[in-house]
Amino acid sequence: MHYSLKSTTFAVIKWKYMITKLKLHNWKSFEDSTLYIDPLTFLIGTNASGKSNVLDAFEFLRLRLNGVTLDNAINQIRGGEDWIIQKGKHNARLEVSVEENGKEYCLKYEIFHDSNGFHEISPTLQLMEKDDYDSDTAFKVVSNNINDIFILDPIPNRMRNYSKVSKHLLKDGSNIAGVIAGLKEEEKKDLEEKLTKYISPLPERDINRMEAVTVGLTNTDAMLYCYEDWNPDVPVDARGMSDGTLRFAAIVVAMLTAKPHSLLIIEEVDNGLHPSRAKELVKVLKEISHDRNIDVLCTTHNPVLINELGNDMIPFVSYVSRDDMGNSNIQLLEDKDNLAKLMASGTVGDLMIMDRI
């Protein structure tokens, strides 16, 4: 069973087209599983459960639809050609469903391996309802949606350096200052105000302003600065900011600059953040994803963050686990057998700690 937020007033039906689910068949550690995508989705599970393999599927499809050759795309995925197809199998298939104005399209993409190497079967597209449709237009809708996927995995050490003024945020967040500085003046001011608003409750320091400033004669490089309540006239550059502050700044900027109707994927969303700030993080994720009409998929294995989601988010949480054969499986949390009975003895996070999910 799956109840989508896209059919509720939460989303106010503002979307044009959005990814609704991903099916994985013989993909890496998965034999046959489905992940449902909502405006805000959490994918939980322990380390090595297979969460990253789900994200690799999105990245692989994005690479291929952006023109990267099959062999190069495979080698850019974690594990490369040795792990992209489940052990003992010869083919892998990915299916992405995209909903556009009430119509659902499904793109099927399959690769196989033989003695001559890897090959692919031409992607097929079908309309899930019986209706006439323009296949070229439909393929463009689906491929554009996949192309717009952005996977964020901030690396604070790379965010502390000067960065070139840029239009698009990099996966590791290293050019965050350059992206902010590259905006038009009014857009830059608005983003910096929102960034300050969202980040001020989170870090250990009392931040009252955050901004990106260009440097040098040509103004082609930028640095991220913050100002603190106890020393408001002395800026602190990114080199003096904590890992948690930088990671959270990257998350906020990614959400504020993401293309409307696109899917933003954030790996280990709470990594480096103090557990006491989990509630604020969840609040920010809900607010920005709703206001900007983007879908956000977060992975986490932190019981504290999972507890902060609250029971109303249970329908939008999926968990990844391994079976006795080592296969990864995705299951909706709400479909867990005896979930209500299990939760009588503790929260979802507590159940994870006790290895009961």
Where are these predicted regions, by residue range?
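Electropositive, glycine-dotted interaction segments
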Residues: 93, 99-212
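Residue-level preference for the first positions of well-ordered beta-strands
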Residues: 40-42, 261-263, 295
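Conserved ABC ATPase signature
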Residues: 204, 208-256, 263-276
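C-terminal lobe/lid and adjacent interdomain/linker elements of RecA-like ASCE P-loop ATPase modules
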Residues: 8-18, 280-357
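Conserved P-loop NTP-binding catalytic core
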Residues: 3, 13, 56-114
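Phosphate-binding P-loop
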Residues: 33-38, 258
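Phosphate-binding glycine-rich loops of NTP-binding sites
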Residues: 38-77, 175, 243, 248-254, ...
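N-terminal pre-Walker A segment at the start of P-loop NTPase domains
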Residues: 13-30
